[in-house]
């Protein structure tokens, strides 16, 4: 008498768990909180100094890529005003970024050299990941 009930209960539980797992993997949303630090660095240059600024940033990023805790950097250019340059950086250690990274010789040199091709100090903001959304 209990066999049909147990079989039905097991079937029901497996169906619910399968449905929940499927919904989570196909929702287009991934609760992806982690300890990574996301940094947005906004630079302003002039039209005349644009190529020099991009070249110097390229050289800097080649050195930064060798650092521990580096994940990636994306350089974005404003299509409406190419004198606006944005670095979208990802690091797996906030302490490293705010500490040792800021003291590296290549970054210190860039900060001095940038005075000749960057208009003022950059706007820097720090972010943490909450979710990732992707196409279904």
Question: Across the structure, where does each feature detected by a protein language model lie?
Answer:
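An amphipathic, aromatic/His-enriched active-site/gating alpha helix that lines ligand/cofactor pockets
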Residues: 67-71, 90-125
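Short, well-ordered beta-strand segments in beta-rich or mixed alpha/beta enzyme
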Residues: 37-44, 72-102, 127
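Bacterial N-terminal signal peptides that target proteins for export
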Residues: 1-10
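Glycine-rich beta-strand-turn "strand-cap" elements at beta-sheet edges
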Residues: 6, 22-37, 74-81, 111-136
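Short amphipathic alpha-helical segments
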Residues: 49-72, 106
